[in-house]
């Protein structure tokens, strides 16, 4: 009996150790998700929050799907997310490669470059709102000193999204740089030495050694920055509040305004569910894409 009891304890120990983590995830992730789904199926707003909530089924979902403002917010989200991912990944990769070199001063530069990521997105938003201000902004002042006309960075629907993308790039790129730098340091230098002996150039080594070995880091980084960009709204709220004319209102900002500014909690919950679905689809797509490319390379 003692041996059987000892065997049970030994086999149950890993599951017992998981209980605290699973409990926290359940409380902070699963319970809010279930509650969000419950809200989306009822008519809930600030005006009737203390009264009985009427069950409306999928009525809220059909209203959101036919809402032209929601369609516009999805288009803005697509532009914002694609621009943010492209710039953050490209600039982050360049900085990671440059600052992973064993040169004096790179540690100090890495510490300096990580500051924008540590700074609150709200502070970043206020800073870039001042920089891009049409009347007294630093950027337009510089353009005027060079004899150029000032640009309506934040009040022109054609430029506002890309202006916010630049601000988000400044805020988020340090994470990509740090993450990919960790990946670069995990690659054994002997691999590069062998490639150099075989006559491989720096560029060939980067595309045929560095990038393939960085795939796990690149995949995780892309998933994270995509999800963060889809859910990002505080910097946009500070810089433009979704304007002008709804041209910088992303789906996450639209959800926030509908739920907390206009008090339409059910509508906000539905948009939140759609955002969760978008995040899951994008994450799954990234994983499938990387696996497919891996299988193609292995088949060669």
What do these predicted ranges mean?
Residues 1-4:
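N-terminal hydrophobic targeting signals that begin at the initiator methionine
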